[in-house]
């Protein structure tokens, strides 16, 4: 990716300087007169440092040059075999026709057979900007470029660097309605790329080179703000804080994406975007890239430099204000699994001020009779804002490996992850299947996980919901829980779970709203409560501080709700069968257990008696049971009281109120 960024940047500058150099030569025609034109062209060549084997100007104002060499920055050069140009003159519009352009920059070579610029705005204002006579910023110079249409038959870029050989070709490129540097519309008939990565000489064994072939069909787009893009690369955000985002790319589509490797093939039917908006970064992109490039070229980085290098590069994301990408018709095939098919109907990604959204529709993976499917999935409100804020604070603090507190500060805002209609069906011995050792047949109707309101990177509000998890228990006899369910008479289960808790900062409490479980032909269990003494130490990221804070926790309240829908009857029968008694005898035996237990903790206590009566009634006729235990003190019951209760259970009863009922 870094090589691609550098290539695009260098190619962009090459095109700009190429057009500028050609325009300087062509604009000389406005002076008038054949002799005067030739003299002006030669003078312009000398001032720009360009050289030409021949210069001819006809009486119609056309400028003809051959074998032109244009010097560029960093000892790079552009060679043009021939140029025919005409400046704006009377009723004639400007025109440039250049042939056989070649650009060399170290390991990179760019060749363009022809460039035709129609309705080119080649006038004195543009000439001053392009030649450097005017005191303008790079962005202001780009804003002087106007043309009706630019046609480029093809652009071939080849480069070899650090064991990577790459050739990329764009075909039938055209840009239209270029006004003050803004491109109204652009398109290309296609793009192909061949990349070969040499094996790492440090790797063990006989490593093979990696070859990647890429092709893209028709590409169409609108609205490129080239002047503002130039500002992003050459200017830092203003010190006064005014840094409004601007759209730099409008809608764009690309069709028929194909990527092939030795192991398989990935295809997209279409990629599209509604556009991207950006803002100026803390420093110009060019400055950051050059500084990162200098550091990465150093063979021996100082301890921590490599980490800081990656963190600084990560900060570039802050320049992206808003954008999106949609991909449809995704397919994957692999030679390792020739019978496997992988398809996704649609993927979408959104980016809005460091908040990302992701969605997927129609995932379908199959191998023989085995399959994995997901109707839809989404991830919303995933925020990188706290991550970038943490990185800035860490870099400001100076070198040094981050401790746990810093690492916690780097955590992004998780947001909400959701799945719908997830299903896996895999079985051992399936023909052309996934070669699993145990059967796995599971389906989930809905699942969501939300981790919100982070404090120092740690979420303070947690929500998890899973509806209708269906699991076939066949083939899982080695799992104790599954084996017990089968003994209870279940061949498959359909269960749902729910977790909801949040931190009450003002009252230093952890509120457990609900931890629930339910199942078809089973019933449901719901637990809620309040844990006191839950302060900011638990969000510090400091392990020692968090461990010490555990001893300050208190129990304030707990509530239990149980509703039977068949599980208790199955459990009672299993208990009776194991102990050689009838179901009635088993129920009678179990109903006596609460009274026996109460004798050791406080027989005669009103709360205990209510609990005994409710549990006994539930055992006799299992339907609904509700139990609530609340600390008498607003501060709750601390660790010392719980430790004392292990020796004297009755001591705990004096500190709580107990209510219980059975329906």
Regions found by a protein language model. Give the residues of each.
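Glycine-rich, small/hydroxylated-residue low-complexity segments
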Residues: 29, 33-663
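N-terminal type II signal-anchor transmembrane helix
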Residues: 2-48
